[in-house]
Amino acid sequence: MGTERKRKVSLFDVMEDPSLSSKNTKSNGLGLAAAAGGGSNLINKWNGKAYSQRYFEILEKRRDLPVWLQKDDFLNTLNSNQTLILVGETGSGKTTQIPQFVLDAVVADNSDKGRKWLVGCTQPRRVAAMSVSRRVADEMDVSIGEEVGYSIRFEDCTSSRTMLKYLTDGMLLREAMADPLLERYKVIILDEAHERTLATDVLFGLLKEVLRNRPDLKLVVMSATLEAEKFQEYFSGAPLMKVPGRLHPVEIFYTQEPERDYLEAAIRTVVQIHMCEPPGDILVFLTGEEEIEDACRKINKEVSNLGDQVGPVKVVPLYSTLPPAMQQKIFDPAPVPLTEGGPAGRKIVVSTNIAETSLTIDGIVYVIDPGFAKQKVYNPRIRVESLLVSPISKASAHQRSGRAGRTRPGKCFRLYTEKSFNNDLQPQTYPEILRSNLANTVLTLKKLGIDDLVHFDFMDPPAPETLMRALEVLNYLGALDDEGNLTKTGEIMSEFPLDPQMSKMLIVSPEFNCSNEILSVSAMLSVPNCFVRPREAQKAADEAKARFGHIDGDHLTLLNVYHAYKQNNEDPNWCFENFVNNRAMKSADNVRQQLVRIMSRFNLKMCSTDFNSRDYYVNIRKAMLAGYFMQVAHLERTGHYLTVKDNQVVHLHPSNCLDHKPEWVIYNEYVLTTRNFIRTVTDIRGEWLVDVAQHYYDLSNFPNCEAKRALEKLYKKREREKNESKNRK
């Protein structure tokens, strides 16, 4: 059966065959046939249980992955270097296999006896962190949340037994705030680095410094594109490894003329493929939940109208706020023919750009690429950050077309012209750090003790104006003093996994005797939309929403929904009957509990104003204003709203619950579409601006507008009241 290993195993030197327990150390192990036959007698080294039959079935597939052939080269290279850049096409197996190779090597190393190390693998998206960790737990034949776990915002599925942890890049950044040297980790893997998310870019600079202070820590940067040379240069010439994908040729088709309606064109193309092309699943890229759900309905309807002349279809949506169980449906097989020998069934996945690189879906032969994605954009001059539907980059187009060649030669239908591809698309997607509001990032860096932001080692430094705006916002919120140092309030704000305005609102809520209510509002704002509006029952859904409506605005409407949910014992049937999203409500309840724990840690009082008091809703609105005083709009005589200070013309979003047009409103979100909308709005009083945020509403540097004149009157009124009060004394 082969010779036994004689030499001592050192870190990253070799990796044991994962089909063997730590007690069975034959160099070639058992052949797969023997392993399958006697698998029940082999002990899983991770949990001490017998391996299941499924483990060996999966192992056979793992050994077919391109990355498997390079595991020895990978471990040897990492053993000799502190940092390694690895480029691998989506489908090469890098996201699932590299962390397991590393974990095996860490566990096999005897140099740290008694020390429990973690291997961390970051993902830019929550969906990927959850989905990949479940897959890897399956491959290792362990329970998710035990030896393998994941950590995303407001959800920690790990335990004291966890050795391999998939987490969003934002969560690793939060861990660094509590543990600046990330002492629990032996190896950190930054996956999907080409996506250049805000958190990943900050982690680049942070980990570069941590590596200097921790020679025992190793870093693997994994990318799906060849921009990796830039990573190499940034990490001082770290070695670069390339793992080939398993791509078959993909034929690219362009449109002759630009499409006026890419959604309609995408649906039309799906139907044409299903009618005319050989069997094979279809992947359609669209920009967001609403668009995807609309497309799924229309595709089902169009195919249904074709009757028996075509095979059955299974249309599956995929976007970040979809429940995990629904997300897993993308891995289901295509439906079988309706009759024996009849037309083949086909799976049609309609996805956001999450399917570009984060997840690999086998069986895809046809890709439909309209050439758009939602991207974050930020204008620091007017302090507006919004998601805009924008053209993708050439790199993204390449990733999308590559999804079609995973299992056999495929076809990609680009719903734009070849000229547009060559002349209009940028080579790479702009890093998020160059198009984002950096207030939260600056707060995180300050908490990490990084004061010199201008000289922080960003791979692509943000514009100075964007940094200055972030510092200004944090100063107005009281998170930074005038010298730019973190205040006590800022320390507490940084502990909340929320935007700075919401954190400030929570911290000051006890002063307004309404922290219980502000906790509920914050939780509701942190989860997907709680209102369900099915196309076939829109009128009934709108009537149900109106029953929760509060005349003073949307924040109080959300509070009403949360209270009703709790009063009805969190009953899913109540949610269904009232067109309320049960999953969103469960998430809100979970988020609220976590926020309560943070409040308790800082001895922030839990309190409420008497519900029957006239001040009940007034206090809640004042507390909200204390956080969102920079997001105020004023009703002009022309009938439209103007954002205060920035003078942007905006309109109340049609989804609002107000029964009137208040003179002043705070808003939670600025939405750029065909018109500029403010969404989630609440009525406030002008005099509260003077009382709650006088430091911001300094009229000496205010633009000349109706809001300024209204505020001047309010200041004069306050001055008169003060003088009258003095005279009475």
Curated annotation (Swiss-Prot):
ATP binds at residues 88-95. GO terms for cellular component: chloroplast envelope; spliceosomal complex. Gene3D superfamilies: 1.20.120.1080, P-loop containing nucleotide triphosphate hydrolases. SUPFAM superfamilies: P-loop containing nucleoside triphosphate hydrolases. One of its GO terms (molecular function) is ATP hydrolysis activity. A motif (DEAH box) lies at residues 191-194. Residues 269-449 form the Helicase C-terminal domain. It comes from the Eukaryota. GO terms for biological process: mRNA processing; RNA splicing. It catalyses: ATP + H2O = ADP + phosphate + H(+). Belongs to the DEAD box helicase family. DEAH subfamily. PRP43 sub-subfamily. This is Probable pre-mRNA-splicing factor ATP-dependent RNA helicase DEAH3. The lineage of its organism: Eukaryota, Viridiplantae, Streptophyta, Embryophyta, Tracheophyta.
